[in-house]
Regions:
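Terminal, intrinsically disordered low-complexity segments enriched in charged/polar
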Residues: 103-105
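Acidic/charged, solvent-exposed loop-and-adjacent secondary-structure segments enriched in E/D, K/R, S/T
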Residues: 99
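Acidic, serine/threonine-rich low-complexity disordered tracts
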Residues: 8-94, 112-206
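C-terminal motif of bacterial Sec signal peptides marking the signal peptidase cleavage site
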Residues: 4-6
């Protein structure tokens, strides 16, 4: 089951502040501009039915929880989606088995590699669903972020196959820094989350 760890004081402050700063009547471009001016990691998330500006609420040993002002949450680790709360996907958990190339996608070339995952979905009580991904770099392209800033990013595609699952994840990565600025990731069969960074998270050194 998806577990939401308690936010640290600073991160809880960021969530509370953004809920106050971003009014319900704000359009998303205005909300993104407001949030970008704040000293908090932030992004724009869209699952095809729900779209929101979100801020980082917690870092649980690298598993990040992102929160909207409507209390919708999704979790990711290394930029890879691993859980949702309050979204139609109903993803309790997703985990990579074996080597994790998403710690630095720049190590993946055009020849590609195989990624093994398991998904846990509440709908239909589908837990431990094995999914295999074929991940490779497919080129570079110019990508605009939610503030209209354009970057030339490396594009990676991951073709997914498993019982009742077929689809493609797409990732756009800064070839110089390795920052995953944009992605479109499977959250459930036929449900994708599109994630666009506004301000990346800089983890403090321990």
């Amino acid at each position: 089951m998806l577990m939401l760890a308690g936010c640290g004081t600073v991160m809880q402050t960021s969530v509370d502040f953004v809920r106050t700063a971003v009014a319900g009547k704000d359009d998303l471009s205005e909300a993104a501009t407001k949030v970008a001016a704040l000293p908090y990691a932030s992004l724009l998330m869209d699952d095809g039915q729900y779209r929101a500006v979100m801020v980082l609420g917690n870092d649980d040993e690298g598993r990040l929880s992102w929160h909207s002002r409507q209390a919708v949450v999704f979790l990711c680790e290394g930029g890879v989606l691993c859980g949702t709360h309050g979204l139609r996907a109903g993803l309790d958990d997703a985990r990579i088995e074996g080597d994790n190339p998403f710690t630095d996608l720049r190590t993946v070339g055009e020849a590609g590699i195989t990624v093994s995952r398991r998904y846990d979905w509440r709908s239909g009580y589908r837990y431990g669903v094995p999914v295999t991904g074929q991940l490779r770099r497919v080129g570079q392209e110019s990508v605009a972020d939610p503030l209209g800033r354009s970057r030339t990013l490396a594009r990676y595609e991951e073709r997914l196959e498993g019982p009742g699952v077929e689809g493609t994840n797409t990732y756009w990565v800064d070839p110089a820094t390795g920052v995953l600025w944009k992605s479109r990731q499977l959250a459930a069969p036929d449900v994708y989350l599109e994630i666009n960074l506004i301000k990346p998270y800089r983890r403090r050194s321990q």
